[in-house]
Amino acid sequence: MAPPRPDYTFTHEHLLGIEGLHPLDIGHILDLADSYAEKTRAGVRPDPVLTGKTVVNLFFETSTRTMSSFEIAARRLGAHVISMPIANSSVKKGETLIDTAMTLNAMKPDALVIRHSASGGAKLLSRKVDCAVINAGDGTHEHPTQALLDLLTIRRVKNRIEGLKVVICGDIAHSRVARSTTMALHLMGARVHLCGPKTLIPPGTETWGAESAGTDFDKVLKGADVVMMLRLQLERMNGSFLPSRREYFRYFGLTAERLALAKPNATVMHPGPMNRGVEIESTIADGPSSVITQQVEMGVAVREAVLHLLAGGKS
C-alpha cells in the first residue's frame, strides 16, 4: 500500500463512472481498498465507519454477485442494508425511476447503489436525491466498481499497473466493464488493447484510452501481461452478431495454446459470469494463471472503500 498523500482529499459526492476521476482518486480508492483486503485476509474486522448509516441497493437488473458484494461490504462496515431487486419493487407496477428516487430520498438513506438497464440511469438518480449514488452498472455505459476491483487485482498480482499490456477480448460493444476498465487502466498508465468480432467492437474506443481495437486475437496476445475475457451478452443482442458460439470460440476463445502466446507469467481475468467453452476453456479459468476468484474477493474490498469514502466521511 502506498503512503498516504497529505495534500490530497477525495472530494467526490458520487461514483457514477471512471470518467471524471483523476488518477489520484483511483489511487486513493485502491489504497484504501487494499487496506480492507489485508484486514479481511488477516481475520481483522474493519472499523464500523458506517454505523448508523443506511445503504439501499436498488437493482433494476438482476446480479446476485454484485448485489451480494455491496451487501457484504456495507454490513462489514456496520451499515443497515436494504436490498431491492426489481421483482420486489413498485417499478413492476409502473413506477418510474424518478418516482422511485423521490420516494427513496424521502426515507433519507445515506447511499444508494443502483444498477439499471439504461445508460445514464445512475446520473439521473444522482440529480434527484440528497445522498451518495454509486453506479453498479448502467446499460452499456459504465461499471466503475468492477473497473476498480480489476485494477486492484492487477496491482496486487503484478505490483504495478503502469506500463502493463492488457488485452481485453470479447463482447466489447455491450460491455460496460470494457469501457470502465479500459478508461481506468489508461488513466493509471497501462496499455490497453481491445479485441473481438468486428460486429462487437463499437466505434470510438480510442476515446476510452485503448491503444488498439482489432479482430486478430492471436496477434494481440503477443507480449500481454494480462488477458481479460468478457462474456457474450446475448441478452443485449438484437441482431445477428455471431454465426455460432462454436465459431466464436474458434477465433476468440482463450485456450492453453492461445495463452502461450502471451507472456509466460500472464494473468487471466474475467468479470463473470463465465460461459465456459465459449469465451474461455475450463482448464484456463481454473488454472494457475487465473485470478478470477481474487477478483471477487477484491470486489468486496473496493466496495468497502467506496462506501467508506462516500457514505462514511471522506478520508
Swiss-Prot record:
Class in the EC hierarchy, top level: transferase
Keywords: Pyrimidine biosynthesis, Transferase
The enzyme's E.C. designation: 2.1.3.2
Keyword Transferase: yes
SUPFAM superfamilies per the UniProt record, alphabetical: Aspartate/ornithine carbamoyltransferase (SSF53671)
Gene Ontology cellular component annotations, sorted alphabetically: cytosol
Pathway(s) per entry: Pyrimidine metabolism; UMP biosynthesis via de novo pathway; (S)-dihydroorotate from bicarbonate: step 2/3
Cross-referenced Gene3D superfamilies: Aspartate/ornithine carbamoyltransferase
Chain positions recorded as carbamoyl phosphate binding sites: 65-66, 115, 143, 146, 272-273
Catalytic reaction list: carbamoyl phosphate + L-aspartate = N-carbamoyl-L-aspartate + phosphate + H(+)
Keyword match Membrane: no
Residues the record lists as binding L-aspartate: 93, 176, 231
GO molecular-function terms, A-Z: amino acid binding; aspartate carbamoyltransferase activity
Gene Ontology biological-process entries: 'de novo' pyrimidine nucleobase biosynthetic process; 'de novo' UMP biosynthetic process; amino acid metabolic process
Family: Belongs to the aspartate/ornithine carbamoyltransferase superfamily. ATCase family.
HAMAP family reported in the protein's UniProt record: Asp_carb_tr
Function of the molecule: Catalyzes the condensation of carbamoyl phosphate and aspartate to form carbamoyl aspartate and inorganic phosphate, the committed step in the de novo pyrimidine nucleotide biosynthesis pathway.
Binding partners and assembly: Heterododecamer (2C3:3R2) of six catalytic PyrB chains organized as two trimers (C3), and six regulatory PyrI chains organized as three dimers (R2).
Name under which the protein is recorded: Aspartate carbamoyltransferase catalytic subunit
Organism, as annotated: Hyphomonas neptunium (strain ATCC 15444)
Name of encoding gene: pyrB
